[in-house]
Amino acid sequence: MAVDAKLVKTLREMTGAGMLECKSALEEANGDLELAVEILRKKGVAKAAKKAGRETKEGLIHAYIHAGGRIGVLLELNCETDFVARNELFKELANEIALQIAAMKPQYVKREDVPREVVEKEGEIAREAAVAEGKPAHIAEKIAEGKLEKFYKEVCLYEQPYIKDDKKTIEELVKEYIAKIGENIQVRRFCRYELGE
């Protein structure tokens, strides 16, 4: 099927993918723009997974001060090369992540960063609450697992729903940018400040 050049251009603007990738996705989707976006997203996730093992030693420190000066965020975002660290898309991602941190107050980057004692304590509290409600031990355990998953979504940046599109997580947002930029990207650390806290 011949693909309209305007459609290719529209898809490219929507996704940031290359012209040939957009053309190929549109051909695969028989001209369906929404399906082509989905195809590119799936390919992007596959690309991001391949790049995830590569070392990130370059990057930037991004500072964000929220309007009114009451909330501030310092973020270290790493990439593979200094060329990418100066890229506008990379800077845009740093700002989006800083906005997320300012709004949603995560405490850790990934679930692996949460100290074991904290996880054990949260699980214990959830189990005890379920038992106090009269739930059997095996049910209390399942409830505790569910509450721990919810806890991770609240305190881990990568697991939080993105504030501008709650259908994707911050980890998925980072993977989209990895696919667009073509390099591994990692949030190394962050610090959120709030006046009076």
Swiss-Prot record:
| Family the UniProt entry places it in | Belongs to the EF-Ts family.
Native organism:
Sulfurihydrogenibium sp. (strain YO3AOP1)
Q: What exactly does this protein do? A: Associates with the EF-Tu.GDP complex and induces the exchange of GDP to GTP. It remains bound to the aminoacyl-tRNA.EF-Tu.GTP complex up to the GTP hydrolysis stage on the ribosome.
Q: What InterPro entries does the annotation carry?
A: EF-Ts_dimer_sf, Transl_elong_EFTs/EF1B, Transl_elong_EFTs/EF1B_dimer, Transl_elong_Ts_CS, UBA-like_sf
Q: Tell me one Pfam family matched here.
A: EF_TS
Report one GO cellular component. cytoplasm
Cytoplasm found in the keyword field: yes
Span list, region Involved in Mg(2+) ion dislocation from EF-Tu:
81-84
Q: Where in the cell is it found?
A: Cytoplasm
Q: Report if keyword Protein biosynthesis is assigned.
A: yes
Query: What PANTHER family does the entry give?
Result: ELONGATION FACTOR TS, ELONGATION FACTOR TS, MITOCHONDRIAL
Identify the domain of life.
Answer: Bacteria
The protein in question is named Elongation factor Ts
